[in-house]
Amino acid sequence: MMTTRAKISLKPGSLLLCGLAGASGQSASLGREMTVAHNVVRSRVGVAPLTWSSRLADRAQEWADHLAARHQFQHSPNSPYGENLFEIDGGSATPAEVVADWASEARDYDYRTNQCRGVCGHYTQIVWRGTKEVGCAMARDGRREIWVCEYDPPGNIIGRRPY
């Protein structure tokens, strides 16, 4: 069985107004695991921990369900939140693995110049100092898992450093 992973990537310098959303319909352990995984990454750069938002989780679940039902993988249009997406085909992922994949983009972020070499928008959203809440959810589409996290307030504002 072949497993592929995909994630939405941003062009360097693009404005990402997105966030993490979580679903209250999913297990409480998903919320705990996602929050812990995000906060481990944030602690590495001295940023305050996020709190879990059932409101954002519900919104994330709605969007994940929408993507799964329509066999799509794209950001929610006109969202007032920050948003990270993750997709795995032919396998499954844990919350820690999803966040670790996004966080691996840290290697492409240069704090000194505030520039990305490649993709780093998922990472910078996770560590965005102004973001206070996160909510995440997952939906299945046959062989695919689609993960959505919503963040409030959103990060990735052009010209500003994440922390």
Predicted regions and their residues:
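Bacterial N-terminal signal peptides that target proteins for export
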Residues: 3-13
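Positively charged, low-complexity intrinsically disordered regions
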Residues: 6, 43, 161-162
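Hydrophobic h-region of N-terminal signal peptides that target proteins for export
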Residues: 15-23
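Short, well-ordered surface patches within globular domains
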Residues: 22-82
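Disulfide-stabilized extracellular recognition modules
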Residues: 78, 91-163
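Acyl-group handling in specialized metabolite and lipid biosynthesis
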Residues: 85
